[in-house]
């Protein structure tokens, strides 16, 4: 839904929500909410994406947060983490100050993830834990935002069972947070503002970045792939690319501010530029432009194999600041399962892509995502995933048990793989993941690698930690002054998922800002 199409800015759910009786809440979503529905969601609007470069917070809202504090709890992916940075930026522009003490915060926001059932259960548990705070301090505001807010079943559950929540808003209208807050302060009922699947591209939103070493940079929003297990196309909307000049300007500003690494974000970054109607411009072109900017390291995530072009491979192969690490989710190694998943590629085409990548980028580190126990997955089909892992030799993988999500096509399939079978398969897969990770790590012993030092180790404050360009965790002892810098470290010991080493020296990146 574009800004001018919005017919209602919010919905107040009246005091009747306190009643325990069952009730039809669908009427509250008219005009501002469209529940996840594959048939409807695939009917992507033909309207051109509207770009708002003139975003400003109305002066009447400035000062709203004076002498008030906020706390944001974030679940989920990097996109959610970046959304939290934007939400924090808006709140600070309103006068609020961040706090880490949930017991004293005046505004508590839970930025949610809808990708797996376990994540949703954690959120509901979190909301429930806040009920006592609302009783003790009725003037605080509690809000739920993020992907779960885009699901009608979730919002219904909050309306019926969690009266301690004051506001619910979605992924498309974060820039309306000042108005939502004002409404929540004035209203005696819950404020719900959840927009449709369309969405605009809003530039110049304030941000409070987490740290000054690494930064997220959105290059696009939404996804049009509609993998049958995934709720994201419903919660994040259609694919919308930012203009390349806006992205490049943001990266240049980050370079001037001294950031050492950026990650280009999108639900499917390989689709970048397909919706730009006035120019032919893709991720390869964007990477080429950013490679000329003085950011020592540039990453991108997440990739879909279907859209990975030879042009992108060629640009990455040129080296420079584009790191030789590609995360390429495969999900399954069996063609029948891939077809049911709606992945749009085959085992053979995936392996062909891997071959082309390795031929052009011999030093590449490939990692992946895999789902175990998809509906109807047989033992033989699962074993094809294991053999594909052997053929590729991934250096790491994020592995998951299949989690049924309401509103997706897969939710209509019978989840007929027993839980004990899923867990046994996951255990076998993870054993293989650990085996290949150990092989990859062992190759570093005795080598000197460049590490971006990010801070102290989680296990020992006297030890520093950082990552190589291939995203390998390295622990080493060095002066605290090295935090935020690129350093050389000699690897003394290779563990299964991390490396231990000795500090050698600081590295000065030889790049010129353009």
UniProtKB/Swiss-Prot annotation:
[4Fe-4S] cluster 1 binds at residues 77, 113, 147. It is found in: Cytoplasm. It holds the Pfam family TRAM. Residues 1-21 are annotated as: Disordered. Its cofactor is [4Fe-4S] cluster. GO terms for molecular function: 4 iron, 4 sulfur cluster binding; metal ion binding; N6-isopentenyladenosine methylthiotransferase activity. Keywords: 4Fe-4S, Cytoplasm, Iron, Iron-sulfur, Metal-binding, S-adenosyl-L-methionine, Transferase, tRNA processing. Its EC number is 2.8.4.3. It catalyses: N(6)-dimethylallyladenosine(37) in tRNA + (sulfur carrier)-SH + AH2 + 2 S-adenosyl-L-methionine = 2-methylsulfanyl-N(6)-dimethylallyladenosine(37) in tRNA + (sulfur carrier)-H + 5'-deoxyadenosine + L-methionine + A + S-adenosyl-L-homocysteine + 2 H(+). Residues 68-186 form the MTTase N-terminal domain. CDD domains: Radical_SAM. Residues 209-440 form the Radical SAM core domain. One of its GO terms (cellular component) is cytosol. Residues 442-505 form the TRAM domain. Binds 2 [4Fe-4S] clusters. One cluster is coordinated with 3 cysteines and an exchangeable S-adenosyl-L-methionine. InterPro entries: Elp3/MiaA/NifB-like_rSAM, Methylthiotransferase, Methylthiotransferase_CS, Methylthiotransferase_N, Methylthiotransferase_N_sf, MiaB_methiolase, rSAM, rSAM_horseshoe. [4Fe-4S] cluster 2 binds at residues 223, 227, 230. PANTHER family: CDK5 REGULATORY SUBUNIT-ASSOCIATED PROTEIN 1, MITOCHONDRIAL TRNA METHYLTHIOTRANSFERASE CDK5RAP1. Monomer. Belongs to the methylthiotransferase family. MiaB subfamily. Catalyzes the methylthiolation of N6-(dimethylallyl)adenosine (i(6)A), leading to the formation of 2-methylthio-N6-(dimethylallyl)adenosine (ms(2)i(6)A) at position 37 in tRNAs that read codons beginning with uridine. This is tRNA-2-methylthio-N(6)-dimethylallyladenosine synthase. It comes from Staphylococcus aureus (strain JH9). The gene is miaB.
